[in-house]
Amino acid sequence: MGLSLGYSPDRGSIGSWICAAPLILALFVISYRLFQSVIDYRLSHRNGCKPPPTYPHKDWYLGLHHVFGLLKAKKENRLPTAFSELFDASGPDVHTLGHYVLGKKSYWTRDPENIKAVLSSKFNDWGLPSARKATFRTCLGGGIFGVDGKEWEHSRAMLKPSFTRTQIGDTATLSKHADNLIARIPEGETVDLAELFPLLTMDVGTEMLFGESVGSLDPAEIKQATRFTTSFDYIVQTMSKHMALPILTKLRDKTLQGCVEFVDDFAADVVNRTIANESKTEKPSSLGKYIFPTELAKMGLPEKQIRIEVINIMVAGRDTTAALLSLIWWYLAKRPDAVMKLHQELEPLGGRPPTGEEVKKMKYLRNFVNEILRLHPINPLNSRTAAKDTTLPRGGGPDGKSPVFIRKGTQLMFSSAALQRRKDLYGEDALDLRPERWERIRPSAFEYIPFGGGPRICPGQQLALTEASYFTARLLQEFQGVTSESSGPFQEAFAILVTSGDGVKVKFHKKH
């Protein structure tokens, strides 16, 4: 006979605990929510603050039904549209709301005044979410887009000279790369521009920032360029997953590690070659230009930090402009009326490549690009975390006019896609692509935020607009027409940026 030294649960008791676990979790969430509600109620009624409407969760405060809904929308390539539906489901004229996931409260807004407070007037009350910081550390080593405070100010100051008027207006450089792009487009054959544009923007970006292009569009470099693009794309997709599920940053990913090492080696080669070339002689191609790695080296930055900043800028410079070009041409291939108007606008040039100033004066082209960015902002969702107890200027109370109290540590999501599709701001046809609307509307600074706003506004926005407009003009000068090989509506694939879920498959037709 054995001697029992302690309690040994039988299978029945273990089963009871397993069955009780969901109930215990639910009770914990409810208790936490009730406690939080009492605290929030007391704090939110200070200084005239009132709570905003709450999203009508089907599973009360767990919020899992809506989370699964967003995941479904992402799989269906309609996630930016789902952001607007979040507000519409919460009531008429709701532009700021409370939202729960596992009992934890966050806020969403598409109100320009609230977005202005977060990005500008109360800039110091808000910081980057910890998930974003961790993601950039894991995937890119850190850098300007994953830091805030003094560290961000320092990175921003180093980067700003790269986007002077002289750098942006260098159409001689753009013309050369436009020729390389055109040489890769066969007449009358299907080509996926979504594959070519990242190569183009990588070539332009590296020459603008480093004084020398990596030559991605050169057939001799295609193998290296393809590997770089594949590695880059995997990193960006992983970053999207990490920001959605921060726990993933703790898990080992051998594929990610290999991609990061390859991109880091690539950046190291670019940095070392650029610094070595600049130290030997001042090449004519670099005269008057701010060569990014060289200037960082002059400031005494360690080589590793230079590589990190270079990779950050390569991500932004390649992907943002490539995504914008893809959006423009997905729609142009469906809109022969727009192509005709753009050809008419280009006709006075007589086939001569436009200058930067001439591109800026092309009114319909500018309106078309503005409308693309309104309907499909490249980054349709952003977020901040309250660095201190603060308030949003409005959105609270039954009429939505009272300020809203935000407790320190609370996350706020703001969607440029939901904002820029508001019918009260852009008309009943706000969901349609209509460039002509820009002949009569003049949205305020925070009613139209395709590149963000405030101190953290995208430093490369003018470069992206110039490149996208210039390359669009050059392709239109080279080809008489373009037809789409895609059927159905635009597929809003969203990772870090919005891209076309089915690529940009088109056929170009030469002028005869």
UniProtKB/Swiss-Prot annotation:
Practical use: Ascofuranone is a specific inhibitor of trypanosome alternative oxidase (TAO), and quickly kills African trypanosomes in vitro and cures infected mice. As an essential factor for trypanosome survival, TAO is a promising drug target due to the absence of alternative oxidases in the mammalian host.
One record GO biological process: terpenoid biosynthetic process
One GO cellular component term: membrane
Induction record: Expression is induced on AF medium.
MF terms (GO), sorted A to Z: heme binding; iron ion binding; monooxygenase activity; oxidoreductase activity, acting on paired donors, with incorporation or reduction of molecular oxygen
Pathway: Secondary metabolite biosynthesis; terpenoid biosynthesis
Keywords: Glycoprotein, Heme, Iron, Membrane, Metal-binding, Monooxygenase, Oxidoreductase, Transmembrane, Transmembrane helix
Binding site for heme: C458
Transmembrane segments: 12-32
Class of the enzyme per the UniProt entry, highest EC level: oxidoreductase
Keyword Glycoprotein: yes
Disrupted gene: phenotype observed: Impairs the production of ascofuranone and leads to the accumulation of ilicicolin A epoxide.
Database matches in PANTHER family: P450, PUTATIVE (EUROFUNG)-RELATED
Function: Cytochrome P450 monooxygenase; part of the asc-2 gene cluster that mediates the biosynthesis of ascofuranone, a strong inhibitor of cyanide-insensitive alternative oxidases and a promising drug candidate against African trypanosomiasis. The first step in the pathway is performed by the non-reducing polyketide synthase ascC that produces orsellinic acid by condensing acetyl-CoA with 3 malonyl-CoA units. Orsellinic acid is then prenylated by the prenyltransferase ascA to yield ilicicolinic acid B. Ilicicolinic acid B is further reduced to ilicicolin B by the reductase ascB.
Name recorded for this polypeptide: Cytochrome P450 monooxygenase ascH
Native organism taxonomy: Eukaryota, Fungi, Dikarya, Ascomycota, Pezizomycotina
